[in-house]
């Protein structure tokens, strides 16, 4: 589904039918869309729900909240918050259990394509990178104040960038210059600085890709939110409820895979203890999730939407 947003920007929802097919197992349940984005998944979920079904969506982005205002359906509600706050928000609505939770972790095309948001190294704009532009510090503010070692750590750990130390040194050195060469505050400035600091290029990838990813993850606390959100989602799932997660890079997918496998195969996480005390095997907790598989976009989808190439969808069911 290609969504035309209220601002005229277009967004192609990744793994639309696959995600909704995996999520909906009864049409009268309460479902969660953890990232409304531009509404592709939410609108398809509402199409599949019966009169007794309900959908609660979350998003940190004010633009997404505005877009959600165009959904005229009494079964739908939107929360301007991170899905990491799912438990608190559902408590406020009196919702104890849900039939399914969908987390689409990708950044939306309108966010990337709007230069003023600061997510893209391909166009000039303020170095912002906040999903929620109403709160928190921008990437520019953090880079102007952070310690060189912290900058290197973030770029290395969240961007898996092997030139993280060199990039951090260049960023800090830039802060000490005066005039137009002062602290970074434009995406084009950061992209140019990284291009100079990175000594070798990966085929088909801009040298700034990993650094921009790392800063976006850090500014928005994406991995911490993911870990909190996964636990909150599992805690709310009713028996038979589905957890569907679409990730777009290895850091996200690693967290999702580890979380699901720990609940589906408790004997693996307990293996070291069992080797020391094998008679305790009968004390192992029963599996709490059933793994239903992993799905990647088809060649046809990737051809139509190259941004879908890195997507991986994992599905699990509450036992």
From Swiss-Prot:
GO terms for cellular component: cytoplasm. GO terms for molecular function: rRNA (cytosine-N4-)-methyltransferase activity. InterPro entries: RsmH, SAM-dep_MeTrfase_MraW_recog, SAM-dependent_MTases_sf. Its EC number is 2.1.1.199. The keyword DNA repair does not apply. It holds the Pfam family Methyltransf_5. It comes from the Bacteria. S-adenosyl-L-methionine binds at residues 39-41, 59, 83, 104, 111. GO terms for biological process: rRNA base methylation. It catalyses: cytidine(1402) in 16S rRNA + S-adenosyl-L-methionine = N(4)-methylcytidine(1402) in 16S rRNA + S-adenosyl-L-homocysteine + H(+). Keywords: Cytoplasm, Methyltransferase, rRNA processing, S-adenosyl-L-methionine, Transferase. It is found in: Cytoplasm. NCBIfam families: 16S rRNA (cytosine(1402)-N(4))-methyltransferase RsmH. Specifically methylates the N4 position of cytidine in position 1402 (C1402) of 16S rRNA. PANTHER family: 12S RRNA N4-METHYLCYTIDINE METHYLTRANSFERASE, S-ADENOSYL-METHYLTRANSFERASE MRAW. HAMAP family: 16SrRNA_methyltr_H. Belongs to the methyltransferase superfamily. RsmH family. This is Ribosomal RNA small subunit methyltransferase H. It comes from Ralstonia pickettii (strain 12J).
């Amino acid at each position: 589904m290609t969504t035309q947003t209220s601002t005229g920007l277009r967004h192609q929802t990744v793994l639309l039918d696959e995600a909704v097919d995996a999520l909906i197992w009864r049409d009268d349940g309460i479902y969660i869309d953890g990232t409304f984005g531009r509404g592709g998944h939410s609108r398809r979920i509402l199409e599949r729900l019966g009169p007794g079904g309900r959908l609660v969506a979350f998003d940190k982005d004010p633009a997404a909240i505005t877009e959600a205002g165009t959904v005229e359906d009494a079964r739908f509600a939107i929360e301007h918050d991170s899905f990491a706050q799912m438990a608190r928000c559902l408590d406020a609505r009196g919702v104890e259990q849900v039939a399914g939770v969908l987390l689409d972790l990708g950044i939306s095309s309108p966010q990337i394509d709007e230069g003023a948001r600061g997510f893209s190294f391909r166009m000039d704009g303020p170095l912002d990178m906040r999903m929620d532009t109403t709160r928190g510090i921008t990437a520019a503010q953090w880079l102007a104040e952070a310690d060189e070692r912290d900058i290197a750590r973030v770029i290395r750990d969240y961007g898996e960038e092997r030139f993280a130390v060199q990039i951090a040194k260049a960023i800090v050195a830039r802060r000490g210059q005066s005039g137009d060469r002062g602290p970074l505050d434009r995406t084009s400035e950061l992209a140019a600085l990284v291009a100079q600091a990175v000594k070798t290029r990966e085929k088909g990838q801009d040298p700034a890709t990993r650094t921009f990813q790392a800063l976006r993850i850090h500014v928005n606390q994406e991995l911490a939110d993911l870990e909190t959100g996964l636990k909150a989602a599992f805690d709310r799932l009713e028996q038979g409820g589905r957890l569907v997660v679409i990730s777009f890079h290895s850091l996200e997918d690693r967290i999702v895979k580890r979380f699901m496998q720990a609940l589906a195969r408790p004997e693996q996480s307990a293996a070291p203890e069992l080797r020391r005390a094998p008679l305790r095997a009968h004390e192992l907790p029963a599996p709490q999730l059933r793994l239903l598989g992993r799905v990647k976009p088809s060649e046809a989808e990737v051809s139509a939407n190259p941004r879908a190439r890195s997507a991986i969808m994992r599905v699990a069911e509450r036992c």
